[in-house]
């Protein structure tokens, strides 16, 4: 069966327990339709880049599944009909990564990020050679 990853965004006014219950509900939908849920994660309340249905924040949930396409379509259909779910994203993947998702890893544990250091190509802002001191330029013009 194909492997999928799903991200659900639920309304911000739900409690954490209700949001986690929503993830469990859709996990059972996948299971009832012949699929297997390989893992679930609750990412918490996050601020979104733009408003969705007048909400600036949302509860994020993540599911890793091994399910037939009919089960995924049924889960997406029910999620879109559910009043508490604002968005659903489903991606077909070649394989699932072991361990927690990138969202759940601590910042220090992310191996692909390098330390920025002092950014040697840019130094501190030194004197501006194209301008002299302010008193040499005369008074600033009046604003109207």
From Swiss-Prot:
It holds the Pfam family Ribosomal_S6. Binds together with bS18 to 16S ribosomal RNA. The gene is rpsF. InterPro entries: Ribosomal_bS6 (IPR000529), Ribosomal_bS6_sf (IPR035980), Ribosomal_S6_plastid/chlpt (IPR020814), Transl_elong_EF1B/ribsomal_bS6 (IPR014717). Residues 92-144 are annotated as: Disordered. Belongs to the bacterial ribosomal protein bS6 family. Residues 93-144 have a biased composition (Basic and acidic residues). GO terms for cellular component: cytosolic small ribosomal subunit. GO terms for molecular function: small ribosomal subunit rRNA binding; structural constituent of ribosome. It comes from Rhodobacter capsulatus (strain ATCC BAA-309 / NBRC 16581 / SB1003). This is Small ribosomal subunit protein bS6. NCBIfam families: S6. One of its GO terms (biological process) is translation. Keywords: Ribonucleoprotein, Ribosomal protein, RNA-binding, rRNA-binding. The keyword Transcription does not apply.
